[in-house]
Each structure stands twice: as structure tokens, then as C-alpha cells.
Amino acid sequence: MINVGAFVASARSGARVVVGGDARGPVVSAARLGMKERLFAFLAHVPLLKHCDAVRRYAEQVRMENRRSLEVFVLALSKRYGPEGAKAAFDYGARRDGAPLDQRRVRNMVSIAEHFHGTGDAKPLARQMVFRSWECRGLDHPGHASLTIKNQADADAGRHVYEHVSWWPNQRLGSKEHFDRIKPKTLDGYRIDKRSEISSATEQRLREGDAARRKILADGFKYANQDERYDARFFPRAGQKLDKDAEWGLSARKVYFPAIGFNHDRRDTDRPRAFVLFGLNEAAMLRDARTVKEGAKSGELKYRMISKKENCASMALRVLRAGGAEHFVPYTAAWISEDPNHAHAYALAVQARIDALNQRRADVERRCERLRDSASVRQAWRAFSEAGGASASPLAEDAGRGRASAHMRQARLDEHAREVERIGAYFAELSAGRSGKHRDRADAALADAMKRCAPSARDDVAALTRKASVLVETLGRHLDAPPPSDSSALRRLAAHAMIGRIEAFMAAAIAA
């Protein structure tokens, strides 16, 4: 089956992409661009010659190839990003009928499909945060921003968490009320947000268009009057769709973030839960979201459309920052007023940094596993590990589920503190035998990171995130080159073990 990657790879040459095929099936490739093709492409733009039969046949053949390529590409986008993402890519990216599917168009259509599908590796996770925004196009179309905290990790659906923060004025604003502080209201779900972001006039046209098409389909086109034929041409644009209650709404841009702690892919419940080291603090975000809603009820908080702190975008950003977004990307406030576009850009930056760190963490895990392929390294590391015998997993599981008693948690924190000290001493012992001339810059950077990033029970989530990011990135760079000796491989395994201690302390910190 042809996938999106095949189109992206073929488009890199700069030529238009075509879909051919043989007995084995369709094949994507870059179009041939020899002297004949170059000549006909030039003649097709010459007024006196473009109507010649040979030139017209060539131009029509190219248009047919381009249409077929576009159809197959949209199908590939649909399979990867869903029908909504593919429709959006077609609506906004394929603007001219028969236009070539070149590198720029492929890149733009993939970007649009990703945008409507949602951005972020956390989308399939059971514990996630979703930042949603609708584009701001001025005071007449201000857009909107909201945030949802989801936790579907528990097998019991009754214990699932769905906390939605959507900040709205309690009344329709007049043209002179953009600076007024008025009573706010909060909406409880994304579906209501979608309905609120589509105008009544657009909704009416969509209903009329749908009704006209149904009537024409049932009665036949020749029996339709002029008004029905006109209404039938009004199709929903990308993002406009009916919900399960047959109400029209406008879908948002979505950015997905993982929650720190144990998580799993909802699509594959058989796989064991894995600890997500880099993410947002779910408990802190829930506390702030509920504080915001209580403030709306009590009147302590107000809504002001043009504001840095009291409009929809600023409230969504407030809850996002409460979860530790600034641990990854510094936040810079808007000069005059927050808006959904600025908020969306910040959310994307945070998501990109979190996903990059988690991908680097997974890469470090795989590379360190390969270090144990050496029998001597594996034996030496097993001897060190068995001498300590401590493990972060019981603490992390119990802390994450809230089942460990305070006494047990403290005992395990003490145990992990001792293990941190033991790993640090082992790393120092391995490094002591290396003279200055044998230590390169990478060795010095890793040794410095091990000193500065050793976790402790006093560290909060921010400190642990900072230490983890420094150690993961430093060790990742160190692993780019193969270890020159067993002691070098063991130093890397010790640094990897220190990351495991950070995970254990992180589990305790988010449960506190």
C-alpha cells in the first residue's frame, strides 16, 4: 500500500510526483523530465503554440497524471491522518485542478493534515492534556482557546478524569465592551466549544445545503429548482462537521501533551505501562483548573476580551503553565492581549520540546540496552546491580496510584537516595582510572552532568525535569560514538541508571 512517506520521498527531487504501476501494484515516483518533457512544458505556455494538437495532448496527459497522483495522495493522507485531516489538506492545499503535486504542495498538504489531525506524540496515550485553539482573525473573529485534562488509565470508566477549561463571557459582547470586565462562564466540553465557534448564518447555510443535496439525490437533478441547485453547492469546509446530536460545529487545532508518570497506549492495552519522564503535572493542572472554575462561580475572576490574564487564551495558558510548561519553554506574555494564535504557537513549542526529550530518552534506553551485548560489560554491570538491589519501580507504581503509606514512601525515598550515592561513587571510581590526556570533552561533560543532576528527595518537579533533561541530552550525545573500552560503557550505564533514579523521585514528587 502506498503511504505518505513514499510521496514525501519522491517529492524531494523537486520534480512533480506521479503514480504509475505494474502487476505488483501502484508505484510512486518522480516524473521523468527529459528534453522532450522540458520542450512540451515550455510550449504549453507559448500563446501561439499551446493549442497545437501535440502540445494539447501532452498538457492533457500531464493534467490526468496530476489528478491521479492527487487522488492517491489524498487517500494516503486519509489512512494516516483520518478523513477530516485529508479533507482539510485537499480543501486548502489542492487549490488548482490538475496542478502538479510537487515538493511544496506535498509539504503543505501534509502540514495541513497534521494540523487537523492534531500535533503531538501523546495523542494515543491514556493520560494526556489537549490544548485546542480556533484561529483569531481580528476582533470580529476573535477565535477561542481551551484546554482539556484527560485520564483514562483506570479500567473502571467511572474513575476516568475529563476536566475541560473553556473561558467565555456570560453575555454577548458589544463593540464597545472589549475592555470591560464582566461575569464569566465556563463550558464543560469540547463539543459545546465547537458549536459556539460556528455562526448561526453558516449553520443555516450548511443545513440548507445538506437538505438540498438529499432532495436532489432522492428526486433527481432535473426536478430540482434553481434555489435547490444553488443551495446544494454549499458544502462544509474542513473542520465543519455534524456531531452525534446532529449539531454543526467547527473543529479546533489540537496540541497533545503527555502527563508525567505511568502511561499506556489506549490502542494497545496488552503492552505494559511505561513511565513518561517528560510531560505535564496532571495533579497540579487539575488543582488550577478547579480553582479557575471556583473563581468564576464566586465572582473572584472576571472575563475581559482584550487582556493578558482574563480572556480565553490567557486562562488556557494559565492552566498549561500550572502543569509545568515553562520547565520546557520560557513563556513570554503578549504586549497588549493574549490571543489564540499566540497561545497556539506557545503550546506547539512546548509540545515539540517535550516530544523531543521523550524521543531522546527512548533512544538512550535502546542504545544502553545494546551496550550489554558485550559479555564482559554485562557481567560487570550485573555484579554492580546485584550488590545494590534497589529498584525504582515499586515506589513509582505505588506513588502514582496513591497506595503507599507515608512511612513506606519515606523508606523508599531513603533507599533511592542511597542508590543515587552508590551510582555516583561507582561512576567516580570508573572515571578515576582515566588520566587527563585520555579524557575528552564528552567525558568531562558527562562527569559534570552526573555531579549536577544527581536527584534527591528535596527536588520538586521543576528541578527533577531540569536534571533529567540535562542528563538525557548529555548522555545521548555521549552515546553517538561507540565506547572505546568496557569502563566507558559502564560509565554510560551508570549515567543511565541515574536517569532511572530521577524517574523514581519524579513519581514521588507528582504524588505529593
Swiss-Prot record:
From the Swiss-Prot or TrEMBL record, give the protein name. Answer: Effector protein BopA
Residues spanning the signal sequence = none
Instruction: Name the Gene3D superfamilies on file.
Output: non globular Virulence effector SptP domain
| Protein encoded by which gene | bopA
This molecule's function is given as: Plays a role in mediating bacterial evasion from the host autophagic pathway.
Instruction: Name the source organism.
Output: Burkholderia pseudomallei (strain 1106a)
Q: Which Pfam families match?
A: SicP-binding
Q: What family does the entry list?
A: Belongs to the BopA/IcsB family.
- State where the protein is found: Secreted
Q: Which UniProt keywords apply?
A: Coiled coil, Secreted, Virulence
A GO term from the CC aspect: extracellular space
Residues annotated as coiled-coil are 347-377
